[in-house]
Amino acid sequence: MITVLDVENTTCKRDGKQHFDPFEAENELVMIGMLSEDTETVVTFTHSDEEPTVGGDVITQDILDATTLLVCHNAVHDLTWIWECGFKYDGKIYDTMLGEYILNKGVKSPLNLGFVSAQYQLEEQKLDTMSDYWKSGTSTKDIPFDELDEYLRYDLRSTLGVYKKQMKRFANEENSSMQSVLDLTMDTCFELALIYKRGIKVDMVELNKVKTEFEEERATLSEELNEFVEELMGDTPFNINSPEQLSTLVFSRKPTDKKQWALSVNAFMSDSAFKDAMRSMTGPVYKTKASKCFMCNGTGMVQLLTKKGTPRKNKNICKECNRQGFTLKNTKELAGLKFTPPKATWASASGFSTGKGILETLEATARGKGMEREGDFLQKLRRLNAIESYLSSFVGGIEKFTKADGMLHVQLTQHITSTARLSGRNPNMQNMPRGGTFPVKRVFISRWKGGKIMEADFGQLEFRVAAYLSQDKTAIKEVLEGFDVHQYTADIITKAGQAIGRQNAKMHTFAPLYGASGYGRTPAEAEYYTHFMYKYRGIAEWHKRLATEALSDRKITTPSGRQFAFPDVSRRRDGTVTNFTMI
């Protein structure tokens, strides 16, 4: 029996974040709606105006026991709620949200039920009043029962309608290759729901220790960096966490008119045009020397007099120093590290970029020229940025989303990316550095006494997959021999004049596998991309075949049967293809 299921539940707000899951003690299951063989069943559990359905637990479980395919829109949410409330279901599922995601073939489009239903021109019309209730802070269980009941029944009928429409589309010959992808996606969805429900245990005491370690390291780094900043910039007030101010320190220049600069500079302009823009639209930054403001005597405030010559009741802000208590004098000595941005890809709307990759390149350049202090400064700056990220993304995320029972339920979603890659949220733990030395990993413990946690990772997975798909003979030979491609990448770039380690070289190993070129990169990095296309000619030819397929068919079908659409792809005058890295 096919059963469409949807739940209505309350939510709560904690630490500025709205929580929809059943793991929060405050959240309650309000209603479950089920539609089977034209029979609608709505079971009420906790509504302010309606008594719970007599025997509701038994009714719900009986329907689930008779179900062979459970259809939902956002199945992870619905499955988690019914499981956490004690109901059992381990049969097949179909998620209409994921079905639509597959049929979209990589083209971004809203996946909410209202939008998808409208796309299929279903007769049911969704109630607009629900969003008004929720925006006003009304709890789901306090929404008038008749309106909530109608809303739930609409969702059931709409989900069923979408399911039937999708089944017809998957049956079409043009989409038939995606049937195996559909089956795998739904099986994966079920397993991801189980992973989400089970969660992982967090040692909050250890988390606080890690937080303290990071905060202490941040304080030490900030102090050391600010000492050198004062040496580089003089007495100019400086916030090392400001990308705009950091840009002036690193490149010793800033736009004279930021608005005009942002309008004039783009990543595709020629190197000569960029250099001309930099000469005409930016100016040098000089060190300053501070002296006590003579107008306010260093207080930042001045006492003005009335027309009668008596002091005014309130003091005014000193216009000479703008309340700072000091004025700055230009020393005519160039400030900062004096690096020169080589090309337009290094520009930003407010000056020049100081992203991770650029700082890595500049550090290597500094050390290559024997500028060890500058290299150390840039290394510490990158470490400070990493610490800030660890504290906000990992420590802060774990603090915010760990439940009262010490369990963290990280969700891996299947419908966010265009490529079908899983993405993490609440919090996203996918960017956690590899290796057992990363301190945050200490906070995850087994829920069982004496239990262990195993960490597993594929080695050079992208390279292996590219070797197989392209059947590149050189790449296959290196995979079989255990060749270290990341170290090879590092060696090529280093020999070309830019020192780089194996870990930082990985991004350059991966990038050409996805069709990226050396455009916009440093000369040493660009050397590797040229070398890659020559050495791995089979991969390069494979990329060209994909581009040709996208041009001729407006889509690409992968070996698994998944399809990706490229409705706007075109060939440029120079022979290259737009959207190449996406292809």
Segments predicted by a language model, with ranges:
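Conserved "right-hand" nucleotidyltransferase catalytic core of DNA-directed polymerases
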Residues: 1-17, 24-33, 37-40, 118-119, ...
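Conserved catalytic palm subdomain of right-hand nucleotidyl-transferase polymerases, strongest
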Residues: 5, 72-73, 93-97, 446-462, ...
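Active-site-proximal helix-loop-helix substrate-binding element of RNase H-like nuclease domains
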Residues: 34-172, 184, 192, 487-494
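Short active-site oxyanion
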Residues: 64-70, 236, 450-453
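Short active-site loop/helix that positions an aromatic residue
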Residues: 76-87, 100-104, 247-255, 459-474, ...
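Alpha-helical scaffolds flanking conserved acidic
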Residues: 92-97, 182-186, 500-511
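Function-dense linear segments that define catalytic or interfacial modules
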Residues: 411-499
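Generic long, charged, amphipathic alpha-helical segments
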Residues: 485, 489-500, 561-583
